[in-house]
From Swiss-Prot:
A motif ('HIGH' region) lies at residues 37-47. A motif ('KMSKS' region) lies at residues 287-291. It comes from Flavobacterium psychrophilum (strain ATCC 49511 / DSM 21280 / CIP 103535 / JIP02/86). It is found in: Cytoplasm. This is Cysteine--tRNA ligase. Zn(2+) binds at C35, C230, H255, E259. PANTHER family: CYSTEINE--TRNA LIGASE, CYTOPLASMIC, CYSTEINYL-TRNA SYNTHETASE. GO terms for cellular component: cytosol. ATP binds at K290. One of its GO terms (biological process) is cysteinyl-tRNA aminoacylation. HAMAP family: Cys_tRNA_synth. Its main location: cytoplasm. Its cofactor is Zn(2+).
C-alpha cells in the first residue's frame, strides 16, 4: 500500500487563505505546475529558494508514492520590462545590450539556471516547456477568449476585457482585490491607450518594426502576452483543471490572477485547485537588488566570492539554511545565520554517519524510545503544509536518540534501529534533498582517479600509435560529459 493512503496532507491555499486537506483530482496522481524563470539574467538566491521550496514538495509527494507530473516552464519571450504590457521584452533588451541574438541570451541563462539548480540538488521537472515552443497553443487560447466575448482586438494587439469578465466572475479573488477599486485608482488615459480599460491585460501584442521576436497571428505579427504562456503550457500538459499551481509570492498579482481569468474565460471553471506561493529571501534585512549591490549570486555561496560572506559554504549547507524557514515565511540571509546553520548541518550529518555504522549500537529485546511516534511526528510536520522547520526539529530529536543510544542510555531493537535509520535517511536525503558532503567528496575523488587512469591509458595508446584506441577513449568520455583537453603540459579534463 502506498504511503499516501496513510497520510493526510494539509496545504495552505492562497485562493481561500486557509489550510485545506489535499485531495488530488485523480487518486494517486498529482499534476503540479510551477512558474519558472525568465531567462535574461542569472538567477538570484531568492529564485533558488522558491524553486527549492517546490522541489521539497515534489520530493515529498514522490516519497509518499504519488505519481507526479511536475511542469516548470522557461519564459523565453513576452515578459516585458517592469511586468507591464507596453515596452521592451526583457530578453530582447538584454540581447541588444550584449549584441547577441535573443536565443543566445536564452541559451546562456537557461544553462546557468540548470547548473545552479543542479548544484543545489534540485530534481528536474517531468517536463520543462518553453514559451516559444508553444506559440500555436497560445494563439488558439486567444481565439477562444475572443470567441467567448472576453477578448478584443485593438490595432493589431489583443486584450483581455477584465470588466466584461468580472460581470460573471471575480477578477482579483486570488490577490484580494476589487475591480471597482482597481479601476478607480488608475489614471484615465484619454483615449491614448489601445485598451478599453486600464486594467485590461495583453493576450497578444503587435510587434513594433524593430522588435526581433515575432510570430504571425490572425491579428498581427507579434508575440504573446506574458500571462498567456503559463495557461497554454499548464493546460497542454496537465489539462484544463489540475491540482497545484505554484510560484513566488511576487507572481500572485498580476500574473497568477490573470492566469485564473484566462482559464475561467476558456472553460468556465477554476483551472487550479490549490494555489501555493513561496515567500521572499532578504539579505541583511533588505530586499535583494542588483542595482543597489545588496545581492548574492547562488554560485557566490560556494565560491566565497561575496563581500557579505566571511567564507565559502557548500550548496547543501545553504539548502539546509533555507529549509529551516517555512516556505511561506520571509527569510533573512545573514552571514551569522548561515554559520549557525552550517554547525547544525554537520551535527545532523555526523549523527547519520554514526547511525549507518549499526555495529556500534547494542540492540536489545525492547525499545525504550518511541520510534514510531517520532516517525509519525516527522510525517505530521510535512503533512502540515510542508513544514520543514518543524521536520528539522524532529530530525534533531533523532540526533539526540543517536547520542543516547551510542552511550547505552536507551535501548532499541534491531527492527526499530533499521526503521530509525531508514526514516532518517528518507527525510534528510530523499525529502529535504540534503547531500552527505563526505560521501560526495569520496565519489568525486574516485571519479577523478578513474578518469586519470583512462588518461594514462590513452597516453600509452598514443605512444604506441594506437590512435583508434586513443580516440575511442576520448569519445566515450565525451559521451559521458567528460571533456579531455590536450596541451603541451599534458591532458586535463573537465565535466
Amino acid at each position: 500500500m502506498p504511503l499516501y493512503k496513510s497520510q493526510s496532507i494539509k496545504i495552505y491555499n492562497s485562493l481561500s487563505g486557509e489550510k485545506e486537506i489535499f485531495s488530488p483530482i485523480n487518486e494517486g496522481n498529482i499534476g503540479m505546475y510551477v512558474c519558472g524563470p525568465t531567462v535574461y539574467s542569472n538567477v538570484h538566491l531568492g529564485n533558488v529558494r522558491t524553486f527549492m521550496s517546490f522541489d521539497v514538495i515534489y520530493r515529498y509527494f514522490l516519497h509518499l508514492g504519488y505519481k507526479v507530473r511536475y511542469i516548470r516552464n522557461i519564459t523565453d519571450v513576452g515578459h516585458i520590462v517592469d511586468d507591464v504590457d507596453h515596452g521592451e521584452d526583457k530578453i530582447a533588451k538584454k540581447a541588444k545590450l550584449e549584441q547577441l541574438e535573443p536565443m543566445e541570451i536564452v541559451q546562456r541563462y537557461t544553462v546557468d539556471f540548470h547548473n545552479v539548480l543542479k548544484a543545489y540538488n534540485l530534481l528536474p521537472p517531468s517536463i520543462e516547456p518553453t514559451a516559444t515552443g508553444h506559440i500555436i497553443e497560445q494563439i488558439e487560447i486567444v481565439k477562444t477568449i475572443i470567441n467567448k466575448g472576453i477578448g478584443y482586438e485593438s490595432n493589431g494587439s489583443v486584450y483581455f476585457d477584465v470588466v466584461k469578465f468580472n460581470e460573471s466572475n471575480h477578477y482579483g479573488k486570488l490577490s484580494g482585490r476589487n475591480i471597482e477599486d482597481m479601476l478607480a485608482n488608475t489614471r484615465d488615459t484619454d483615449g491614448q491607450s489601445d485598451k478599453r480599460n486600464h486594467q485590461d491585460f495583453a493576450l497578444w501584442k503587435k510587434a513594433e518594426p524593430e522588435h526581433i521576436m515575432r510570430w504571425p497571428s490572425p491579428w498581427s505579427d507579434g508575440f504573446p502576452g506574458w500571462h498567456l504562456e503559463c495557461t497554454a503550457m499548464s493546460t497542454k500538459y496537465l489539462g484544463s483543471h489540475f491540482d497545484i499551481h505554484g510560484g513566488g509570492m511576487d507572481l500572485k498579482f498580476p500574473h497568477h490572477e490573470c492566469e485564473i481569468a484566462q482559464g475561467e474565460a476558456c472553460t468556465g471553471q477554476e483551472p487550479v485547485n490549490y494555489w501555493m506561493h513561496a515567500n521572499m529571501l532578504t539579505l541583511n534585512g533588505k530586499k535583494m537588488s542588483k542595482s543597489t549591490g545588496n545581492n548574492i549570486l547562488p554560485s557566490e555561496i560556494y565560491s566565497g566570492g561575496s563581500p557579505f560572506l566571511t567564507k565559502a559554504f557548500s550548496a547543501s549547507v545553504a539548502r539546509f539554511f533555507m529549509l529551516q524557514a517555512h516556505y511561506r515565511s520571509n527569510l533573512d540571509f545573514t552571514n551569522d545565520a548561515i554559520l549557525a546553520a552550517e554547525k547544525g548541518f554537520y551535527r545532523l550529518m555526523e549523527a547519520i554517519g554514526s547511525l549507518k555504522n549499526t555495529a556500534q549500537f547494542t540492540t536489545s529485546n525492547t525499545t525504550s524510545i518511541d520510534i514510531k511516534a517520532w516517525k509519525q511526528n516527522c510525517y505530521d510536520a510535512m503533512n502540515d503544509d510542508f513544514n520543514t522547520p518543524i521536520l528539522i526539529a524532529h530530525l534533531f530529536e533523532g540526533v539526540r536518540f543517536v547520542n543516547v543510544l551510542k552511550e547505552n542510555k536507551e535501548t532499541i531493537t534491531t527492527e526499530d534501529l533499521l526503521d530509525f535509520l531508514t526514516t532518517m535517511n528518507a527525510f534528510v536525503f530523499d525529502v529535504l534533498g540534503l547531500e552527505d558532503e563526505k560521501l560526495a567528496t569520496n565519489n568525486n575523488d574516485k571519479l577523478d582517479g578513474v578518469v586519470e587512469m583512462l588518461i594514462q591509458m590513452r597516453k600509452q595508446a598514443r605512444d604506441n600509435k594506437d590512435f583508434a584506441m586513443s580516440d575511442q577513449i576520448r569519445d566515450q568520455l565525451l559521451a559521458l560529459g567528460i571533456q579531455l583537453k590536450d596541451s603541451k603540459e599534458g591532458t586535463t579534463f573537465s565535466i
